[in-house]
Amino acid sequence: MAAFKPQWNDWCPGCGNFGILNAEQQAIVELGVDTKNVVVVSGIGCSGKIPHFFRTPISGVHTLHGRAIAFATGIKLSNPDLVVIVNGGDGDLLGIGAGHFVAAGRRNVDMVVILHDNGVYGLTKGQASPTLKRGEKPKSLPRPNINDAVNPIALAISSGYTFVARGYAYDVKHLKELIKSAIKHKGLALIDVLQPCPTYNDINTKEWYDKRIYKLDTLPDWDPVVKKPEEVNEKIKRAIDKSLEWGDRIPIGIFYQNELVPSYEERIKANSPAYLDYTPAKQLIEKEGKLTTIIDPLLKEREVD
């Protein structure tokens, strides 16, 4: 393994990515997770640089545009003992990567997906991303956006994610606690992080968010956790209803959590009882990369005349 060597951070001054990076690092340290077992996976975009900027010695994988979830799924299923955290922009995860985003929910792999949600493609000069509202015109666009926006919270819940939350990049302490909860959750977790882009999005600024954001856990009757199967539909309905609240008031916090759903690792073990004891990462391979397991006798038994 190459020596750990963090790179100099080149995000724009005031970028919400700084808060997300700090929250992730603090969450990992406070949970006491062995950093040798942490893998941060990213796609392409400003958020894609995040593995390079960690000051804690984690393993980082900077992957292809829209494919971070696919890479992360392979990493986690190969070695379920790892803590796998995906970082991707709204364009990366909900544009070119939308298929992987939805398919991941059906599997419920035990990993965390952190969505950097700023409404624009920051790396390529501020084009409208899938989360920019129709009719909005940040300074990077010559005309108002003509596409409707994706609702990340509602999409994640309807796709099958079992932990769904929203954070705010400039409230690092609150975001840190969300990330800690997501890591401890047994199943697929999404945190949609509202992240101002001071360079290209002059609508959803820090000042704009600060006047609107409130925390769900300040509501006296808010309880997003499913405790028995009969509660699922009502909890989902309430979470999606809250996700539609946008304008003068914007909620952050945990919208939905359900640990009654078996993780993908548990489902694999049900079909292959030795899976967790003898995962792909533990299987021996030759120097040339070939498996040492001989499966010819097994295939012979299954030949059809």
Swiss-Prot record:
Q: What is its EC number?
A: 1.2.7.11
Which residues are recorded as binding thiamine diphosphate?
I44, G45, C46, S47, H65, G91, D92, G122, L123
Q: Looking at the record's lineage, which domain of life comes first?
A: Archaea
Q: Which Pfam families match?
A: PFO_beta_C, TPP_enzyme_C
Specify the enzyme's EC class, one word: oxidoreductase
User: What residues does Mg(2+) bind to?
Assistant: D90, N118, V120
Q: Which metal ions or organic cofactors does this protein require, according to UniProt? A: [4Fe-4S] cluster; thiamine diphosphate; Mg(2+)
Sequence positions that bind [4Fe-4S] cluster: C12, C15, C46, C197
Q: Which reaction does it catalyse?
A: a 2-oxocarboxylate + 2 oxidized [2Fe-2S]-[ferredoxin] + CoA = an acyl-CoA + 2 reduced [2Fe-2S]-[ferredoxin] + CO2 + H(+)
Q: How is the cofactor bound?
A: Binds 1 [4Fe-4S] cluster per subunit. Binds 1 thiamine pyrophosphate per subunit.
Q: Which Gene3D superfamilies does the annotation name?
A: 3.40.50.970
Question: What InterPro entries does its record include?
Answer: 2-oxoacid:Fd_oxidored_beta, 2-oxoacid:Fd_oxidoreductase, OFOB, PFO_beta_C, THDP-binding, TPP_enzyme_TPP-bd
Q: Which molecular-function annotation in GO is an example for this chain?
A: pyruvate synthase activity
- Site features described as Plays an important role in the binding of CoA, chain residue numbers: K125
Q: Which UniProt keywords apply?
A: 4Fe-4S, Iron, Iron-sulfur, Magnesium, Metal-binding, Oxidoreductase, Thiamine pyrophosphate
Which PANTHER family does this chain map to?
2-OXOGLUTARATE OXIDOREDUCTASE SUBUNIT KORB-RELATED (PTHR48084), PYRUVATE FERREDOXIN_FLAVODOXIN OXIDOREDUCTASE, BETA SUBUNIT (PTHR48084:SF2)
Its assembly, as annotated, is:
Heterodimer composed of an alpha and a beta subunit.
Can you name this protein?
A: 2-oxoacid:ferredoxin oxidoreductase 1, subunit beta
Organism, scientific name: Sulfurisphaera tokodaii (strain DSM 16993 / JCM 10545 / NBRC 100140 / 7) (Sulfolobus tokodaii)
Name the gene: ST2298
